[in-house]
């Protein structure tokens, strides 16, 4: 599972969702979804803007957690 770490990053830096969306010139509802970890798809331009603005790497913004669901790869 991939989850967003945006909430902890901007909360720690005391940056609001509204300020971030305004500063990176991206729609507030989309940034809010990333903040709340509600996104099903991650737009590349948004990821690029957020990482550049916050001066972070993509792996700091998006966290991969192994799922407990077993997937059978035997074919």
Curated annotation (Swiss-Prot):
Keywords: Toxin-antitoxin system
Signal sequence region: none
Annotated GO MF terms: DNA binding
InterPro entries documented for this protein: Cro/C1-type_HTH, Lambda_DNA-bd_dom_sf
Keyword flag Translocase: no
Coiled-coil region(s): none
Pfam families: HTH_26 (PF13443)
Role description: May be the antitoxin component of a type II toxin-antitoxin (TA) system. Neutralizes the activity of cognate toxin YopC.
Subunit description: Forms a complex with cognate toxin YopC.
Name used for this protein in its record: Putative antitoxin YopB
Organism expressing this protein natively: Bacillus subtilis (strain 168)
């Amino acid at each position: 599972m991939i989850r967003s770490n945006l909430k902890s990053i901007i909360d720690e830096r005391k940056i609001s969702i509204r300020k971030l969306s305004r500063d990176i010139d991206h729609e507030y509802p989309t940034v809010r979804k990333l903040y709340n970890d509600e996104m099903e798809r991650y737009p590349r331009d948004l990821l690029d803007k957020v990482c550049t603005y916050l001066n972070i790497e993509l792996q700091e913004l998006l966290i991969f957690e192994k799922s407990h669901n077993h997937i059978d790869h035997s074919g």
